[in-house]
Amino acid sequence: MGAAFKARYRRNKETLEWYDALAMAVAIIALVFTFGVRIVKVDGHSMDHTLSDGERILINLLKAPDYGDIVVVDGYTDYGKPLVKRVIAKGGDTISIDYETGTVTVNGEVLQEDYIAEPTYLGYDVEFPYTVPEGTVFVMGDNRNQSLDSRSSYIGCIDEQDILGKVLVCFLPFADFGVVK
């Protein structure tokens, strides 16, 4: 009886250790997803060819936005779905868009935008040159001629506090898995 009891005790101990490890892993994952990262679904075609409609992306909730970062803004408009756009300019910057040549200029420097689908020919109601208010960012979709973004007063500049996070990785569908730049 002593050997059977010891064997059962070892099995129960191993099972409890396994459950403890599983509970710890679940707790860590919950903390990371609560305070560090979040999953968002891309809605629409404004970021084509960088990100496509329906893709799932992982965003970093803790990183402040920088030039060229793709960010997610949640609940900013009555659209009701997260906006996914690229940071073009930050507070204090002056941006100009030449719709004839399709070029974007920030503080007198033409941006090298190898990520855009085509040159920027579509304009909205914001007049250029435009100075971005402090504490905000000017965002645009990579598919410029299919994107409603900071060029429109409907969206306008985004308050930095309204940015949910920076896009890190596209993970679904698996064929598109990779770091987003």
Q: What residue ranges belong to the model's regions?
A:
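Short strand-turn-strand beta-turns centered on an Asx-Gly dipeptide
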Residues: 105-108
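RNA pseudouridine synthases
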Residues: 85-96
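A generic structural signal for residues embedded in beta-strands
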Residues: 59, 73, 97, 139-140, ...
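Protein maturation boundaries and topogenic segments
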Residues: 1-82, 158-181
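Beta-strand-rich cores of mature extracytoplasmic or soluble domains
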Residues: 126, 130-181
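Residue-level "contact hotspot" at macromolecular interaction interfaces
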Residues: 50, 63-64, 88, 131, ...
